[in-house]
Regions:
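N-terminal maturation segment of proteins
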Residues: 1-366
Length: 366
């Protein structure tokens, strides 16, 4: 279908929606009305881009994802890099020392399936303690190569997903729980299954049967998938499970669990460096090799992983903000409703309610 026709159809639908006034007392219908309008607006923006329109990184993320990531300067990452320099003493560059450290925590390829199965089972068990999932829900896992992403959930409908894990690069032990939660329970698989059950099947909202990737829905999806890791596991619960189950299953030294996650916790604070590389690269301020070098220097990505990430930027552009900004917005939204010290049941309840509702990123801002 020609792009001009898609744009005209989306514009007409926005006009029709503007003529409909949902009952103010019906919060869900009000959310649905705003959600549909904003999804259609993002479709028009995407069509405009495919037709040749040039947007800055921030203009694009606002148009497509209803959000703009904060700007961070090099100096803001330096304190964390200095901390890592102390935590990882020795000769050579910091990235070389970090890579050497991480190499000791890779999951051997012949143990990968077993480790992921254990992580998935635990994530599912924890999710089922707090969420009622549709009968028959399930997913299968495939291991693939030659992708720009590390993991992907292909939702098949009827409460089933295909989850693909990219094995181009070695997979470290922390990725087992991260991917099991993010792609599966309580992340993308649960998100899509609950939308299908609660909104499409129970309420007849046919629009839920279509997932527009380059839309505000993706910030909610990626944000909840990343925050879902913290919902499923407190820091101490995760360390205990890694120590007693996953490290032994991977043949790794369980006595080093705390050491490993102390380093990873510091590295995680550098996540917004990835946004800055993407912003500068996609704005034309730096080239691809400079973006990869930035990722290596400020986001602590190995050269191979940085190169993979720049391929992701080529494919998905400002989508990168959905992971870290999305997580932060979801975290702020839920903690504003149940507090930072709220009990696990309260947090799960707010989290599941968010998964099963048509909220926009702008709805999450308190």
């Amino acid at each position: 279908r020609p792009l001009s026709e898609i744009d005209a159809a989306a514009s007409a639908l926005i006009g029709q929606l503007a003529a409909v006034k949902p009952a103010a007392a019906n919060e869900l219908e009000t959310l649905r009305h705003r959600y549909l309008t904003r999804q259609l607006e993002s479709m028009r923006a995407r069509v405009s881009m495919l037709s040749g329109a040039k947007l800055t990184f921030d203009e694009e993320s606002q148009a497509l994802y209803d959000a703009v990531a904060p700007v961070h300067r090099e100096s803001e990452f330096q304190a964390t890099l200095d901390e890592l320099n102390t935590l990882l003493p020795g000769k050579g560059s910091l990235i070389d020392r970090y890579d050497a450290f991480r190499n000791a925590f890779q999951i051997p390829s012949d143990r990968l399936g077993r480790v992921f199965d254990l992580a998935i089972a635990e994530c599912r068990s924890r999710t089922l303690q707090h969420a009622t999932l549709p009968s028959g829900e399930s997913f299968t896992v495939e291991y693939v190569r030659n992708k720009s992403w590390s993991g992907y959930n292909w939702y098949q409908g009827i409460y089933r997903s295909l989850i693909q894990v990219n094995v181009d690069l070695a997979i470290n032990i922390d990725r087992a729980i991260d991917l099991a939660c993010h792609e599966g329970y309580p992340g993308h698989h649960v998100y899509n299954a609950l939308l299908e059950k609660n909104l499409m099947r129970d309420r007849g909202w046919v629009e839920v049967s279509v997932y527009a990737l380059f839309s505000p829905q993706s910030l909610i999806a990626e944000g909840t998938a990343n925050y879902g890791i913290e919902v499923a596991f407190s820091e101490q619960e995760r360390l205990a499970f890694e120590r007693s189950v996953l490290f032994p299953a991977a043949g790794l030294d369980a006595a080093r669990v705390e050491e490993y996650y102390r380093i990873q916790k510091a590295v995680d604070r550098l996540s917004y460096a990835g946004n800055e590389a993407a912003r500068r690269y996609l704005n034309g301020e730096i080239d691809r090799s400079a973006a990869a070098a930035w990722l290596t220097r400020f986001a602590m990505m190995s050269p191979k992983r940085a190169e993979q990430r720049t391929r992701f930027m080529d494919d998905y552009r400002s989508y990168v903000i959905n992971y870290n900004l999305g997580k932060d917005l979801v975290k702020q939204y839920i903690e504003a409703r149940c507090g930072t010290d709220g009990n696990a049941h309260e947090r799960w309840s707010e989290f599941i309610a968010l998964l099963a509702s048509p909220r926009l990123p702008s709805d999450l801002k308190q």
